[in-house]
Curated annotation (Swiss-Prot):
Protein family membership: Belongs to the IPP transferase family.
Gene: miaA
Primary enzyme class: transferase
Signal peptide annotation: none
Keyword tRNA processing: yes
Protein name: tRNA dimethylallyltransferase
Reactions accelerated catalytically: adenosine(37) in tRNA + dimethylallyl diphosphate = N(6)-dimethylallyladenosine(37) in tRNA + diphosphate
Lineage of origin: Bacteria, Pseudomonadati, Pseudomonadota, Alphaproteobacteria, Hyphomicrobiales
């Protein structure tokens, strides 16, 4: 090996990121590090398309399936875990692969040192979002943090709630916290950046094929296991695409066919949102692959 290299591979769900990462890892004798917020959770092996046992036996994979789904795992915790890996593997080539744009941005730009938000505050605002809707909370956000409100959509419920819960818990605006960032773990010019975006029709075909395969491999058993944990539906792991839809099927609220079609629809929409985010947030240093 000529020297340590760091490769970042981002892209929407079902774009072929993991296969590309595996190929490059074998060529570079590199480690693979998860950069996807859902693949960190235990239990959700099939539904989040985590690497197979064959993959992990071929190349060492880190930060996959090690977080209890009852926990609210944050980007700050992920950065802390990445930092430990960087200190452990000081000369090994690394590949960061996943579909969570916020993780990549935090890796390259650092994050704000926002204190942990108490669960009671977090749940209060999520319940208000469900009850009052994003637009009503958006108007409230304008009153407490106009700088941030100007930057986000009135329909972006998650970001609106995040800003309100931070203000509620800390008495400081999220826009204030965002000015105080940690030092990036990886310098922007010290990595190869690959953005994988297949043609839309091909991507949708892959999504449908993979979801059908997930059912054959036992995705419903994972949903049953999650249901037995009786976790709050507000937890991130319980919001993984496939969990709410198939729980509704198991509860007799819709047919299996309706649930599966809904999962396919939600996955397509998620992929579309990912693509939009990557194109709007990533700069020209990212090499676009199709």
């Amino acid at each position: 090996m000529k020297g340590r290299t760091i490769t970042l591979i981002a892209g929407p769900t079902a774009s072929g990121k993991s296969a590309l990462a595996l190929q490059i890892a074998q060529e570079k004798n590199a480690l693979i590090i998860n950069t996807d917020s859902m693949q960190v959770y235990d239990v959700l092996n099939i539904l989040t398309a985590r690497p197979t046992r064959t993959d992990t036996a071929t190349v060492p994979h880190y930060l996959y399936g090690y977080v209890n789904p009852a926990l609210h795992y944050s980007v700050g915790q992920w950065l802390c875990d990445v930092s430990k890996l960087l200190m452990t593997f000081t000369s090994k080539s690394l590949i960061f692969v996943g579909g969570t744009g916020l993780y990549f941005r935090a890796l390259l730009e650092g994050i704000s040192k926002i204190p942990d938000i108490p669960d009671v505050v977090r749940q209060k605002w999520r319940l208000r979002l469900d009850k009052e809707g994003a637009e009503n909370l958006y108007r409230q956000l304008w009153q407490v943090d106009a700088v941030l409100a100007e930057k986000i959509s009135s329909q972006d419920g998650q970001r609106i709630v995040r800003a309100l819960e931070v203000y509620d818990a800390t008495d400081k605006k999220l826009s204030w916290w965002q000015k105080k960032k940690t030092t990036p773990l990886i310098a922007r010019n010290c990595s190869e950046k690959l953005l994988l975006i297949p043609p839309r029709q091909l991507l949708y075909e892959r999504i449908h094929k993979r979801l059908d395969s997930m059912i054959e491999k036992g995705a419903l058993e994972e949903v049953i296991a999650m249901k037995k944990l009786a976790l709050s539906p507000l937890l991130p792991a319980m919001k993984a695409i496939g969990i709410p839809e198939f729980i509704a099927y198991l509860d007799g609220k819709q047919s299996f066919e309706e649930a599966l079609e809904m999962v396919k629809t939600q996955t397509r929409r998620y992929a579309k949102r990912q693509i939009t985010w990557f194109r709007n947030q990533f700069d020209e240093e990212w090499m676009l692959l199709s």
